[in-house]
Design a protein with these regions (language model features):
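Class I (Rossmann-like) S-adenosyl-L-methionine-dependent methyltransferase catalytic domain
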Residues: 1-34, 39-87, 131-210
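Non-membrane alpha-helical structural segments and their capping/turn regions in soluble enzymes
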Residues: 65, 110-117
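A short acidic, Gly/Pro-enriched loop at the edge of an enzyme's catalytic core
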Residues: 86-98
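A short SAM/SAH-binding and catalytic strip from SAM-dependent methyltransferases
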Residues: 97-111
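Flexible, active-site-proximal loop/turn residues at the rims of small-molecule/cofactor binding pockets
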Residues: 104, 116, 136
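A short glycine-rich, Lys/Arg-flanked "PGG" loop and its adjoining helix->strand segment in the class I
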Residues: 114-126
Length: 210
């Protein structure tokens, strides 16, 4: 992530609430001691849910130091780690499962998205799980106008700019298919979630096996 991107999340860390629902049933086959990584964990919301459900070996990493500080203050027992970039200082196959919630939306660049997915594949053991939740292209007039303006500015349809300087991306199913190529799909569902501004949007959730 660029320095500008990291600065955006640091500046907004105190105010943001993340809402993508965590379907614990999709993780039910994992032992409670399974090694779980929440990549792009923010302030640790999903880690707290995992801990409350009995998982004891989950860690979260994020580029935003302010997000990590917020999470540590609210949940001092959570394993929250600030990272500077890729690759992570972890061996191949270090994790039984990786959670990737609303992270691809924060990465407008194709090459950066592919680099992240390659790194997550490296970190997941053979047979391990990848649980992705991210925004699909929306069909309302407001977002369609954003996509048109974003395509003119960034050269990619689905990339758009927030008024506060944030740059985000929504995806086609085909784009998510390509990013998850080589993983075996186990389950998927469309879910309704809300944006930072409170707008209701549709996200696609998938759990797949490496």
């Amino acid at each position: 992530m660029s320095a500008a991107g990291q600065g955006y999340w640091d500046a907004n860390a105190a105010a943001l609430t993340f809402t993508h629902p965590l379907n614990l049933d999709w993780l039910a086959a994992l032992p409670k001691a399974a090694r779980i990584l929440d990549y792009g964990c923010g302030y640790g919301r999903t880690l707290a849910e995992l801990a409350a459900a009995g998982w004891t070996n989950a860690a979260g990493v994020d580029f935003s130091a302010a997000m990590i500080e917020r999470g540590r203050a609210a949940g001092p027992t959570l394993d929250l780690r600030h990272i500077a970039g890729l690759p992570l200082a972890e061996p191949d196959g270090a994790y039984d499962a990786v959670i990737l919630f609303a992270v691809l939306t924060t990465i407008p660049d194709d090459d950066e998205q592919r680099a992240l997915m390659a790194e997550l594949r490296r970190l997941i053991r053979p047979g391990g799980l990848l649980y992705v939740s991210d925004y699909l292209l929306q069909t309302d007039a407001r977002n369609l106008a954003r996509y048109e303006a974003g395509a003119a500015r960034h050269g990619v349809y689905g990339v758009w700019d927030r008024d506060d300087g944030g740059v985000f991306r929504h995806h086609t199913r085909e784009a998510l298919d390509a990013l998850m190529d080589g993983f075996g799909l186990i389950a998927e569902a469309e879910v309704e979630t809300t944006t930072f501004s409170g707008a209701k949007v549709t996200a696609l959730q998938r759990v797949a096996r490496r």
